[in-house]
């Protein structure tokens, strides 16, 4: 149920060390005006819907099915929210969930930890975030990573930032990686040309030489906080960066920060975990991107909805949705912690959808 795509030996060692461990799930929420560009994302059918995606996802993951949610899960063009996958796992396995607000236009409707960030401006401006905010969020990441690190367990770090694969492409490009054509998106056919055009607009604004400045120019508030959290937590325990393109971008950011400022990091303790729909997406090149960045193993759950009774789940097999809010990482955790099979995962997710339909 778990496949290792890169850095095989390091990935195997990580999995062996964390068998039967109950993790903590940190869900980091942020916002970028890049996500409001028409056609940039399917994580919300319209730009207006996308303003509430992160808030609605967090409410559902923490509270589960409710007849009257404050923020209902936004309608998707096709498919079901990955929040169903994440919620099914954390609910059934009683995994603790902490929600962090790195920079949202509205506060979450659940208990959360305020980080003092801000929503990002569109990366095409070349001034997405104030540099003081970027450095503050990194310091917060270091603090919380140290607080949540567990020697006998691990920390899953997931995110929700609509438009985040575009900011990921931007910071990868800003850090010197030739990532165009390799990233993924929520579209069944990745919108590479649109993403690259936006990134080029942002990069045209100024020359950038420092990783903090790359985030300030082109990033979103989640990225720098997660980088700090992973660096600090790796010193004591395991870290599972739960996501595809976005977490590979964070891994590149960590490497840049460590190279520039010599922050102590234990590379043996960090992996990137996603879904097979991201890792094997033929409209991107996730594995090639992971190899280009190096250092961290790329793993993916082999979760498969081919036999699901719900068309909204079968849509994942056609390339829709793919990943989000730590879904792949949580599915990996279910296999590690309780040895869940594909049947176990699908049943838990379908039960949740059935409950929602009857609510």
Swiss-Prot record:
GO molecular function: nicotinate-nucleotide-dimethylbenzimidazole phosphoribosyltransferase activity
InterPro entries, sorted: Nict_dMeBzImd_PRibTrfase, Nict_dMeBzImd_PRibTrfase_arc, Nict_dMeBzImd_PRibTrfase_sf
Database matches in CDD domains: DMB-PRT_CobT
Cross-referenced Pfam families: DBI_PRT (PF02277)
Coiled-coil positions: none
Matches recorded under Gene3D superfamilies: 3.40.50.10210
UniProt cross-references to PANTHER family, sorted A to Z: PTHR38811, UPF0284 PROTEIN SLL1500
Protein family per UniProt: Belongs to the UPF0284 family.
Protein name (Swiss-Prot/TrEMBL): UPF0284 protein MAE_56900
Organism of derivation: Microcystis aeruginosa (strain NIES-843 / IAM M-2473)
């Amino acid at each position: 149920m778990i496949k290792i795509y890169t850095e095989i030996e390091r990935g195997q060692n990580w999995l062996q060390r964390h068998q039967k461990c109950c993790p903590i799930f940190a869900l980091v929420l942020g916002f970028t005006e890049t996500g409001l560009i028409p056609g940039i994302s399917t994580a919300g059918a319209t730009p207006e819907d996308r303003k509430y995606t992160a808030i609605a996802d967090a409410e559902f993951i923490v509270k589960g099915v409710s007849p009257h949610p404050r923020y209902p899960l936004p309608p998707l063009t096709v498919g079901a929210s990955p929040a169903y996958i994440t919620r099914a796992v954390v609910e059934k396995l009683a995994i603790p969930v902490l929600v962090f607000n790195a920079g949202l236009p509205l506060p979450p409707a659940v208990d959360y930890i305020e980080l003092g960030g801000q929503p990002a401006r569109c990366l095409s401006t070349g001034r997405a975030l104030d540099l003081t905010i970027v450095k503050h969020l990194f310091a917060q990441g270091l603090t919380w990573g140290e607080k949540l690190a567990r020697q006998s367990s691990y920390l899953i770090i997931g995110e929700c930032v609509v438009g985040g694969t575009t900011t990921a492409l931007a910071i990868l490009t800003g850090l010197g990686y030739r990532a165009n054509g390799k990233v993924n998106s929520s579209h069944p056919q990745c919108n590479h040309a649109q993403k690259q055009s936006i990134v080029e607009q942002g990069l045209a604004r100024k020359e950038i030489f420092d990783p903090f400045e790359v985030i300030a120019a082109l990033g979103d508030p989640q990225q720098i906080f997660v980088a700090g959290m992973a660096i600090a937590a790796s010193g004591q325990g395991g870290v599972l960066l739960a996501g595809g393109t976005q977490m590979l971008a964070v891994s590149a950011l960590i490497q840049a920060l460590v190279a520039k400022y010599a922050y102590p990091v234990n590379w043996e303790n960090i992996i990137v975990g996603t879904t097979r729909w991201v890792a094997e997406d033929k409209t991107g090149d996730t594995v090639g991107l992971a190899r280009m960045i190096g250092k961290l193993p790329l793993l993916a759950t082999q979760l498969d909805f081919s036999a699901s009774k719900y068309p909204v789940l079968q849509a994942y097999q056609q390339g829709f949705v793919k990943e989000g809010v730590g879904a792949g990482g949580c599915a990996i955790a279910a296999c590690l912690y309780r040895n869940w099979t594909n049947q176990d995962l699908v049943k838990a997710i379908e039960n949740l959808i059935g409950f929602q339909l009857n609510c």
